[in-house]
Regions:
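Cytosolic regulatory modules rich in charged/polar residues
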Residues: 1-174
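Alpha-helical transmembrane segments and their membrane-interface boundaries
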Residues: 6, 113-251, 255-259, 263-277, ...
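Active-site His/Glu-centered metal-binding helix of metallohydrolases
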Residues: 289-290
Length: 305
């Protein structure tokens, strides 16, 4: 609802009754001047308790959150979420009140964005529905599957370059899927948390602070998992030096995968690219490749083949 600051409470109530016939729910009462420029908002309690002869200019609240017609949907959603608003007024470039956006409108937008981000994280490159035709579904899914295919072929090619290592220590071959899986899982975890933080506008501070935090977290997780690998090796009678090699490789891979999963979404966001694309096959495939390379180079340094 919209009222003029020059009106009295009595005339305001009369006008509001007229406007109420055209709305299903009253979220807020906005106050404008004679040129329809937004001046503030009016509390229903203040309206009901004020004298009927009191002017609206004496009781309205001048502090009001608003957005312009050029404000992006994502920014509107963040503002309404931050201040817990049921509705927010919309003004044009001159400050004239042109409408409002309600929480119902934003909920629909958030739902659509969540569905899109989920599809991107799952490796679906465009918005599709389950009942779309085969052509549309194929076009949406195939690009990331092709990326995964080339990533897998790259891993095979890399493994071929370490024939000597696999001949000398065939046990390394059996731990390769474990290293690749841990790299992919850690990368997806890190990227998912960062993407969520970017969406909620809570990822703040310097890149250096984020770097120190992620390295510290990766060191803790990697050390615990590496220790479990060593204990497993001791339990099954595996060569201790091989267990240490695998444990150190896993620690290194977890650190690198965590950094990739953290900073790729941040960099994409700063470049104006949707960071959600970094949470799925892209992170998994890249971390698989880096993980395998790192695994065998560390094994080469320790085992000396």
């Amino acid at each position: 609802m919209k009222v003029k600051e020059t009106w009295t409470v009595a005339s305001c109530v009369i006008e509001m009754r007229k406007q109420a016939e055209n709305v299903t729910r009253v979220h807020s009462i906005y106050v404008t001047d004679d040129d329809d420029k937004l001046k503030g908002r009016l509390s229903l309690k203040d309206l009901l308790t004020a004298s009927t002869k009191t002017h609206i200019s004496d009781v309205y609240i001048s502090k009001v959150d608003y957005v312009s017609v050029d404000t992006k949907d994502e920014e509107v959603a963040k503002i309404m979420q931050k201040y817990d608003l049921e509705a927010i007024p919309v003004v044009d470039q001159k400050g004239v009140l042109v409408g409002r956006i309600t929480i119902d409108d934003i909920v629909d937008f958030i739902k659509e964005e969540a569905e899109k981000d989920y599809q991107l994280a799952a490796g679906i490159s465009q918005d599709v529905e389950a009942d779309d035709n085969i052509y549309e579904l194929t076009k949406a899914r195939l690009p990331w599957l092709v990326l995964g295919l080339f990533g897998g072929l790259g891993s095979v090619y890399i493994l071929q370059g370490f024939d000597e290592a696999l001949s000398s220590y065939p046990i390394l071959f059996f731990f390769t899927p474990l290293i690749a899986a841990m790299a992919g899982n850690v990368g997806v975890q890190s990227s998912a948390i960062i993407v969520q933080g970017l969406a909620n506008d809570v990822v703040k501070g310097s890149m250096f602070h984020r770097l120190i935090k992620e390295v510290g977290l990766a060191l803790i997780n990697g050390s615990i998992l590496g220790l479990l690998v060593v204990l497993f090796g001791a339990f099954v009678g595996q060569d201790f030096i091989v267990s240490i090699t695998i444990a150190l490789s896993m620690l290194s891979v977890i650190i690198i995968a965590s950094l990739i999963g953290t900073f790729v979404p941040i960099i994409l966001d700063r470049k104006g690219i949707d960071p959600a694309i970094a949470t799925g096959p892209f992170i998994t495939t890249s971390n698989d490749i880096f993980g395998i390379i790192l695994f065998f180079y560390i094994a080469k340094l320790i085992l000396g083949f």
